[in-house]
Amino acid sequence: MEQERIMQRIQKDVRALLIASKNGLSIHELEQDYRMMIGSHIPIRSLGYKSTMELLLDMPSVVKIHTQLDGTVKLSAVVDETTRRIADLVSCQKDRCTARTRNRRRNIRPRCPVDLVRRGRVSPVLPATVKSDLRDLLSVSPLLLSELEKAFSSRFGRSFQYTRYGFYSMLEVLRSITDIVEVKQTRAGSLLVLRNSETGRISASLCVKQSQLAIDPKKTSCVLEQCLKEPRTPEKKTSETVTYLKVSPPEPQKLSSKESPSVTRSTSPLINSSNKEQRLKLNVLLDESLKSNENKAPPVTNFTSAVPSHNSVLSNSLVGNSVSSETLFTKMSRPTSHVEADHSAASEPDASVLEWLEKKLEKELKLCLARKGAGGSVSDALRMDIQHVVNQHSDGLKISQLPTVFKSFTGKDLPFKELGFMSVMELVGSLGDILCVESTVDGKDWKLFDAKKKDLVDEFSAGLPSTSSILSSWNSSQQTTTPVKPVGTIFSKVDEKLWWGPLELKLCSTEQIDIPPDAVRNQKLHCLPSMKRGFMIGVYVENIESPSQFYVRCCGKDTSEKLEDMMIEMRHCYSNECVSERYIVTDNCISVGQIYALRVPGDVWWYRVIVHDIKNSELLDVFYPDFGNVATVKKSWLRFLKNCYMKIPAQAVPSSLPYVTSTEDQWSAQAIKKFQQLCSCIPLVGMVLQYVQDILHIFLCDTSSEEDLYLHQLLISQGLAKMEPEHACKKISKKRNPFMQYLTPSQEQPQEESSQLSVPSESSQSEIPCAKEVKDEDDLGMPYLEAFPSGSDVWDENWAFSDGACDYDTAPTIPKVDTQKQQENKVSQETQPFKFCIDSADASVVHHPLEEFYISLIKSRKSQESTDIQQSPPTEEQHVAEISHRSATEQLQGGSSSSMLCEKKLYYEKEDLPYCQQSKCSFSPLLGFQRLQIPRSATPVALGPAARLATAGRLLYWASEPR
């Protein structure tokens, strides 16, 4: 009835909303209008529907569903006789959909908004790097304006986003680069041409003439005469000057007397004559002299012309055009046959010449590539002014003083912003061909020097090879091979990351590699805090070598879950190529005992590892502190570990199974294999016994099946191990874990306490004191596996393990109670093993989950109420004692309390077998302790893992039903 009433109300509201809408509503609009009118959502869940559409399909008398062409759904109301008049009035309303649509379109923002940079009165400037890209693009060939963006994207791999720099249109961009780009109107459209193309035309004509000379060398003189007659415009040192760079050994300073003075004048690279025609005539005379002396000794110019003409490099350069023209025409005037003959006669140069060639090539490439970059946008006039200002300061000019000195020299500001540079440092860095930058003594500023003068000083200080050694090595008949190193160039000394050349040279040249500031250096991981005796914890068994030597990893929010989260973060971090390259560990940073991050190829996870041994230059042994494994890996797989991944302590704890030993001198392969099968891929319940020399002795129990399996008991029952009569502490103390030296004790537990737990005293072995405190779950950061009631309604709630090892010859005693009957039966209790039987109350009395009434056999609170123990007369087979009723108060969450009376009977059973024979039959390590019987009427779930642990240890078992 309630659902029918709700359904009728919803139909009424939906009909009202749809009738009021002239053009219908979508499902989303209907839900929104319903929420605005009623104040709550449509109760589809309470009516048993999964969606609003499913609800509307069940209301055909109220809603019409229309599917439009674009796939959207529109809802309209079904009009009946009672609502027809209202529907007619709504249909006569004035349609305002146009205004609504217009307003909506104004408010709609694009998914990927592009906000233009709002500027003030200052006109935007295109950055120098972008100018350099445009100049490089147009230097190949002119482009139409419509094809500019496509060509820019195909050449540089990115789009030309001029709006990022403050421009609103391409017209503004072209206006800002009128100094390098010229727009010409053609029939095809606006054509973008690079300005100052005369130099390009001259270089092109030179290339054509050179190719003609290579085909017909006899026409050399005619071509030279034609070049002399051609009118030559004065050369302008612009950014688009294209010349031929020639790599040659150094020119000799002294010549023999047999050589003509014309040869001396023509081969000197320091000729400074204003008459260019005279220099060309000298080159013609040089060619004639070379032809006349074919059979004579080769002149000194052989090593100048020995380099073939096709090996010259075509690139932008700042080398003087006059010197380049001279060397070019000198090469062109030499016939090809003579060049080949001299080249075959010449021998390999020595190491000094090759070193000079390497430096020369490096310098030439640096000049060419620097001019090709952002520095090409700087005009020659500004270059000369900056160079002149720097030359006035022989000791160097500070970069911070350059704008002031430049203004005092030229009377105007340094226009670095107008050229597209963000700072003076960026401008100076682009002028690496004319300026040299060095750091000051204090390291707070930079000094500028003239690059040419600096190179001359360096060459003079380093010393050039002598002329005689060069000539003798060049003209000698002996053939020697000298390996030539690849050349790498740093474009700017300000930013040394601008590297051109093989990456190996850059890595070798860097003497000191930067180590990330958050990299872990000379630190140790912390161990997990030591657990008290009798503490129960879930564990994973790792790296099993034998039942006496394995590792355990604790389960819990503060241990295994945090480790998984850390590994996920490490995978996300180190999977980035930039981060992985930054944290690469070099050979000089690898040392034994240091912790690093490691990923083996084929695996997706990163692990924390500690270097244990370095085998050779490539391989090393590492220890996994979180899993206990040892593996051999390559050095290249290591990465520096970030400091944030050192918070979690090492998770692997070296452990051993107590009270069991191998049947022979060593553990058999069958026993090790069986132990590995029992521990594989499943969490186990572990109970801490003690620590001996940092090795945890722990009992392991498999509770995944219906019947609990205790590993030490199973190994002994199958004959794979034997019970140890005494715990071999002395033997184990000699076997220290070698990997514990790489870890440091936990900060949560002082070292004094851990030492007391690891080495038990002799006095503690004779008696077992009562535990009065229970370790809190949050102290160790471990999940507490069981709960127990606050009342002390079982005999063993004040009983706990001692800090020392158990003595098999002495049976533990029950805590003293101030009753007369207990004192009378004290002798029989100390000399005979007992069995206890407890009859639990009916399960219907329990008002809370059964897990809250777990029985703790390990730790509990002290009893708050006294108990009266009544003992029945002993029979021949067993001693029976009955315990009176006791009440235990349980605190509830809401503040209310409820009491439950548990009637329990305590029976003492006398065994026929002596105690020594009973120890042989029992496989539990806790020998000599009292046994507790539970009737089968009790609920097994209420026992918990602690009681199940005692059951397998023959301390707790089911009592036989009374007949």
Curated annotation (Swiss-Prot):
Q: Which family does the record claim for this protein?
A: Belongs to the TDRD5 family.
Biased-composition ranges, Low complexity, are: 745-767
**Encoding gene per record:** tdrd5
Q: Report domain Tudor positions.
A: 589-648
InterPro entries named among the record's database cross-references: LOTUS-like (IPR041966), OST-HTH/LOTUS_dom (IPR025605), SNase_OB-fold_sf (IPR035437), Tudor (IPR002999), Tudor_domain_containing (IPR050621)
Which taxonomic lineage is given here?
Answer: Eukaryota, Metazoa, Chordata, Craniata, Vertebrata
Ranges for the HTH OST-type domain?
6-79, 122-197, 378-452
- Gene Ontology biological process terms in this record: P granule organization; spermatid development; transposable element silencing by piRNA-mediated DNA methylation
Quick one: a GO cellular component term?
A: chromatoid body
Q: Which UniProt keywords apply?
A: Cytoplasm, Developmental protein, Differentiation, Repeat, Spermatogenesis
Q: What does this protein do?
A: Required during spermiogenesis to participate in the repression transposable elements and prevent their mobilization, which is essential for the germline integrity. Probably acts via the piRNA metabolic process, which mediates the repression of transposable elements during meiosis by forming complexes composed of piRNAs and Piwi proteins and govern the methylation and subsequent repression of transposons.
Query: By its UniProt entry, which CDD domains does this protein fall under?
Result: LOTUS_3_TDRD5, Tudor_TDRD5
Q: Which Gene3D superfamilies match?
A: 2.30.30.140, 2.40.50.90, LOTUS domain-like
Where found, per UniProt?
A: Cytoplasm
The UniProt annotation puts the region (Disordered) at 233-274, 745-768
Q: What is this protein's record name? A: Tudor domain-containing protein 5
The family database entries (Pfam families) matched by this protein are listed as: OST-HTH, TUDOR
According to the UniProt entry, which residue ranges have a biased composition of type Polar residues? 254-274
